[in-house]
């Protein structure tokens, strides 16, 4: 019964996200919403390995950036449409996550964190020096103003389901967020999720009990990397321009790590809550003050929650409920 209600809510949110694109004329809400939803997916994806499995990953921006550049390469090589670009980005980053995980997941603690940070640095350096994708100068991706599928006009100012690409991408990202939530919720309630929790709590004990820890970590890394890559695949199509400094920004890794910790890593709702609250504050700060203070906001929240509420928003709410009882 509870599961049916959950999926009905998901369906209702998909319908609402489409209605929003049809009823709202101002384009800024879609821009701000796109930025916040990107953070939600990144936070959820990070939490699969970092929260459920206990492996702190500083390389989220590497998968995001490589997903963005995978889309650029597929567009330049084959003039691939948006959905193919996103698919290529997800597959490439999943395979890269598998390879990276195999090389690094035998490391633990700070050594694993440093290895993932090194992946970010190496990835950005390679793209900086790859002229085919624009190198340090970046590359443009100019989407068509119309998009049709099986004769149906998806994007078009005259009679399309969406009047422009920004609205279409916002809707697609809403769907991706909801799909990611379903994936994370399924992991939490599965044998896979219980195995990740076991290795997070005590990896040696889990191994001695026969839990296939390496297999679980590789699966978690693949899923996490694929979701980050797919999110990155949206980036050049939405911005129409991508360059290494923004695609591989350390801000992306910091946000992906901090938002689950602030929201709470035990359940999928924690990363969503952390990303929505902090993402909204960042958008408000960008408009009213300056985007330069966005990381300051994240840092202050992170320090405060580490000291006063180490289990995040959800843990704090749970404690307050217990006190009330």
Residue ranges and their predicted role:
Residues 1-325:
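Transmembrane alpha-helices and adjacent helix-loop boundaries
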């Amino acid at each position: 019964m509870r599961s049916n209600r959950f999926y009905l809510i998901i369906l209702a949110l998909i319908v609402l996200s489409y209605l929003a694109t049809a009823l709202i004329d101002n384009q800024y809400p879609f821009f701000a919403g796109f930025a916040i939803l990107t953070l939600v997916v990144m936070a959820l994806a990070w939490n699969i390995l970092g929260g459920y499995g206990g492996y702190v990953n500083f390389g989220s921006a590497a998968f995001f950036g490589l997903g963005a550049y995978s889309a650029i390469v597929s567009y330049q090589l084959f003039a691939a449409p948006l959905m193919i670009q996103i698919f290529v980005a997800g597959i490439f980053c999943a395979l890269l996550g598998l390879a990276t995980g195999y090389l690094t997941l035998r490391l633990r603690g700070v050594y694993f964190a440093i290895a993932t940070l090194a992946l970010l640095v190496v990835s950005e350096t390679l793209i900086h020096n790859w002229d085919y994708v624009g190198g340090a100068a970046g590359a443009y991706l100019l989407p068509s103003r119309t998009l049709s599928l099986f004769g149906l006009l998806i994007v078009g100012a005259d009679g399309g389901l969406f009047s422009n690409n920004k609205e279409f991408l916002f809707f697609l990202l809403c769907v991706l967020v909801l799909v990611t939530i379903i994936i994370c919720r399924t992991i939490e309630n599965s044998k896979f999720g219980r195995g990740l929790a076991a290795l997070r709590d005590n990896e040696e004990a889990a191994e001695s009990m026969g839990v296939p820890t390496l297999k679980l970590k590789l699966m978690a890394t693949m899923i996490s990397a694929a979701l980050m890559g797919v999110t990155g695949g949206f980036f050049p199509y939405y911005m129409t321009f991508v360059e290494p400094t923004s695609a591989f920004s350390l801000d992306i890794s910091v946000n992906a790590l901090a938002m689950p910790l602030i929201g709470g890593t035990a359940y999928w709702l924690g990363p969503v809550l952390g990303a929505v609250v902090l993402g909204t504050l960042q958008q408000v700060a960008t408009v009213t003050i300056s985007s330069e203070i966005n990381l300051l906001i994240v840092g202050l929240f992170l320090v405060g929650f580490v000291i006063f509420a180490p289990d995040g928003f959800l843990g704090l709410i749970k404690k307050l409920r217990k006190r009330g009882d």
